[in-house]
Every structure is written in C-alpha cells, then in structure tokens.
Amino acid sequence: MVADVGYLAIMVAGLGAYWWQHLRTRPRISTVRELFTSDAEVALHVAVHEATTRRQPLSSLHLLYGLLQDEAVVAAIVTAGGNPDSVEDRVLTALAAPTDESDQADEAGRLTRRAAALGHHAGHQASCTDLWAALTGSPAARLLDDCKVDRGATLFALCHGGRAPEITLPDERDVFIVLRNDNYTTQEFVCSLLRDVFALPDAQASAVMLATHTTGRAVVGRFTATAARDKIQRARALARAQAFPLWIGVEPA
C-alpha cells in the first residue's frame, strides 16, 4: 500500500527537473540511471525520440508510446483483455493531430516525477510499472479508457503477474479473506474499503492495512463462502473504478 505520493513528488521534483532538462540531449546520464530501471529508461528514450522527431513537447501520449514498446507492458495489456496494437494505432493518430501545446506544459515532467516518487517510496528504481501507474488522470489514461483497456487490470498483471484469482468455493465452506500488498493502492483507499465493505472499525481497518503494508499480506477476517464472494466482488469493483491493482482473495479457514 502506498501513502499519498504528493509529498514524495515534491522530494524528488528538483532531481526530476535536473534529469528532464538533460534527457533530451543526453538520455543516458547517470542521474537517469539512478532514478529508473533500464527498461523504464528505454521507454523514456523512445518517448523522447518520438517527441523530438515530431517537434512536439513531451507528453503523456509520448510516454504511453514508449511504454507500448516494452514487452512486459504489452503482455500485461493482453492479459487484461486489451489490444496493444490498437492502442498504439490510436496513440499515433492522436500524436499526428494538431494539439494545444500549452496544455502539455511540463505534463511529462509531472508524470515522470510521480513515477520516480512511487519508486522512491517503494525503495527501488522507478520501473515501467511505475510509469504506467503515473499515467492516471492524464490524456494517455483517457485514451486507454476510450480503447477499453482496463488500466487497473493491466497494473494488476504488472504487479502480480496475472489476472485476479477466480473465487470458486463450495457454499458450505468458511474461508479467510486475504489482502496482499502492492505499491500503488493507497492506504486511504484500503482503510475506506475495509470500513465500508467489511464493516471493520477504524482502528481495526488501520491495523489490517498496516499489517498488509509491512508484512506483505494480512487476513481481513473469516467469512462464509457466500459472504466472501460478495465482499470480494464489491471490493474489486471499487478498486477497478480507481484503477488500483488491489489483490484480494481467499485462503482455506
């Protein structure tokens, strides 16, 4: 689980501005390597090259184009039921259309700083997964929505390596509902979900959230199979609406 990354973005803003200022002319400087994994660096290089070739300010659409050249991102989109080739066609069409460049002022800088903040918070270099998560709220995210790409399911595949597990249980069984940690679902969202869907008191909701964050997993509680299916479906729907890669499933009681 991740806290509000706004303050973390401020922490890395100065460093982010430095590498962005130099990225266009020296894309392989050490500062970039300190902030981003090699795969993310390649995606950023592709994005910058595409923007430079078109004589456009770097935007979220260029970043998305760069991400679409990454095999793991493409595989995750497919896993989530999307068509990456169709998305790339839509991106190229959008980049070829006239745009108001004033609307794109520092857009890519904000997104890459957010990705760097996500990586910093998790204690690792920012990856293509962080860049994908950082697209939230951008024109690229809206294009993905228009293409019927499930951004949350794609992020889930990038984080957890596949689709959310099916919940097929005999009705007579009791099960434990379990949460697993990720670096993108916010702590505030998890606490709200535990209160609203599972009716946990504030203190217990915070305790379960913190246990998930610190140990990697936590048990929400014991439920009948029927109740577990209903609550997990509700929880996943809420997470999907905000494109969070929340892992919630069951274990035998």
Map each language-model feature to its residues.
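Terminal domain-initiation and capping elements
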Residues: 167-253
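Histone-fold recognition with a strong bias for associated Lys/Arg-rich disordered tails
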Residues: 1-167
